[in-house]
């Protein structure tokens, strides 16, 4: 089905810079997310028919579409995030490519291009309307496509009261991209039987397995002396960082893994001879493997300190989120419903693990099973991001279909 307001709604959203900031100590991490929620989303939530709309101190904009049939007693939620990834989001100037011809798309005057030779996903979209960047920013389809799709579905349900539905709760939250947005999610306030994040990628994605995730912060304390008299005295903190890294499995890196394979990912190294720091993320699907990875890093640090004769390597491990499969497999109802709806719509469900996480990874462990469905974005988190309008329309169809089926 086509939805006349979907494209304009999406274009309005992506033009607002809502980039999150991992170094911030506030919630949300950026004022722009607060402004987007209060000045753009909340007024529109009211316009499309949501009631009891409010903004919580945790950064979530919440609204309710009351049940229009008292016999439908379930309560369901739909959730998307407002923030965008750590890439330029100022001055987003989307291009709308109607009836895509399958050829190279020039991204404005930036010199960058979307070439099917480099991005095979483009081969799926001839004849469709694509929204791209101009090559200077990301697009923000992750996850403003999800917000636009949820908003459009609510608008449609409000305009069609003949579609009987249970109570629907909507939540638009902050800081998903930096992994902290759902930390303060109020599950008791949201109060639904189950929910869906609309935060997936291509058509048909239906996901209930995520990584379990941890962060590792390492501090290496060296001892700097003049290199001319360094023998037996100098301890080079940068060399300690190298030595630590070289003891991790050589092939357990993101660029060498896929499917259910986990990894260690070195994100950042800074320092000098005197002092160095390194940041890693740790990812795996199975709980035992996840715990083993953390234990391995601690073992390396302990071994190095023993060999050095002092505690020059300090490791701080922080769990970030866990594989929501552990929760959702106890009751697969949300998956069964979404899968059946997609199949009825002629969409082939793609049920595979997310090599990442969603807000649902945390919300599921708060007592609300929250799998993830597609929102349409491709090549997310950078200048090559794009989305198909037709896929977005199918996401709206899926949301409405889920509501109809309850």
From Swiss-Prot:
Molecular-function GO terms, alphabetical: metallopeptidase activity; tripeptide aminopeptidase activity; zinc ion binding
Reaction(s) catalysed (UniProt annotation): Release of the N-terminal residue from a tripeptide
A single Gene Ontology CC term: cytosol
Keywords: Aminopeptidase, Cytoplasm, Hydrolase, Metal-binding, Metalloprotease, Protease, Zinc
InterPro entries linked: ArgE/DapE_CS, Bact_exopeptidase_dim_dom, Peptidase_M20, Peptidase_M20_dimer, Peptidase_M20B
Cofactor binding mode and count: Binds 2 Zn(2+) ions per subunit.
Location of the protein in the cell: Cytoplasm
CDD domains: M20_peptT
Gene Ontology biological process terms, A to Z: peptide catabolic process; proteolysis
Superkingdom, taxonomy of origin: Bacteria
Manganese as UniProt keyword: no
Transmembrane segments: none
Coiled-coil intervals: none
A Pfam entry, by short name: Peptidase_M20
Active site: 83, 176 (proton acceptor)
Function: Cleaves the N-terminal amino acid of tripeptides.
HAMAP family (UniProt xref): Aminopeptidase_M20
Descriptive protein name: Peptidase T
């Amino acid at each position: 089905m086509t939805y006349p307001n979907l494209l304009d709604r999406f274009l309005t959203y992506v033009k607002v810079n809502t980039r999150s900031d991992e170094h911030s100590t506030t919630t949300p991490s950026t004022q722009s997310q607060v402004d987007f929620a209060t000045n753009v989303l909340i007024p529109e939530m009211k316009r499309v028919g949501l009631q009891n709309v409010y903004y919580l101190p945790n950064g979530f904009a919440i609204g309710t579409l009351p049940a229009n049939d008292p016999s439908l007693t379930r309560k369901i939620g739909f959730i998307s995030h407002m923030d965008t990834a750590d890439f330029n989001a100022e001055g987003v100037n989307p291009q709308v490519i109607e009836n895509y011809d399958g050829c190279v798309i020039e991204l404005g005057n930036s010199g960058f291009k979307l070439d099917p030779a480099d991005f095979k996903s483009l081969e799926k979209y001839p004849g469709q309307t694509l929204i791209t960047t101009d090559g200077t920013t990301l697009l923000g389809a992750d996850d403003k496509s999800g917000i636009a799709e949820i908003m459009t579905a609510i608008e449609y349900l409000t305009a069609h009261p003949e579609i009987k539905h249970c109570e629907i709760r909507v939540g638009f939250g902050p800081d998903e991209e930096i992994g902290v947005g759902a930390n303060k999610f109020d599950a008791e306030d949201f109060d639904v039987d189950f929910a869906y994040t609309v935060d997936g990628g291509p058509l048909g994605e239906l996901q209930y397995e995520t990584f379990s995730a941890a962060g590792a912060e390492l501090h290496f304390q060296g001892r700097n002396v003049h290199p001319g008299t360094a023998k037996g005295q100098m301890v080079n903190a940068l060399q300690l960082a190298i030595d630590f890294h070289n003891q991790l499995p050589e092939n357990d890196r993101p660029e060498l893994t896929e499917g259910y394979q986990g990894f260690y990912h070195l994100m950042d190294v800074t320092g000098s001879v005197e002092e160095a720091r390194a940041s890693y993320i740790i990812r795996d699907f199975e709980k035992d493997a996840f715990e083993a990875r953390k234990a391995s890093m601690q073992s390396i640090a302990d071994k190095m300190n023993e060999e050095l004769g002092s505690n020059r390597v300090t490791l701080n491990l922080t769990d970030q989120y866990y594989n929501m499969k552990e929760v959702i497999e106890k009751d697969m109802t949300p998956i069964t419903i979404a899968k059946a709806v997609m199949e009825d719509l002629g969409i082939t469900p793609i049920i595979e693990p997310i090599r990442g996480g969603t807000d649902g990874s945390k919300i599921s462990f708060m007592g609300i099973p929250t799998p993830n469905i597609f929102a349409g974005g491709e090549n997310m988190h950078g200048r090559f991001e794009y989305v198909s309008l037709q896929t977005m329309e199918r996401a709206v169809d899926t949301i409405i279909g889920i509501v109809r089926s309850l």
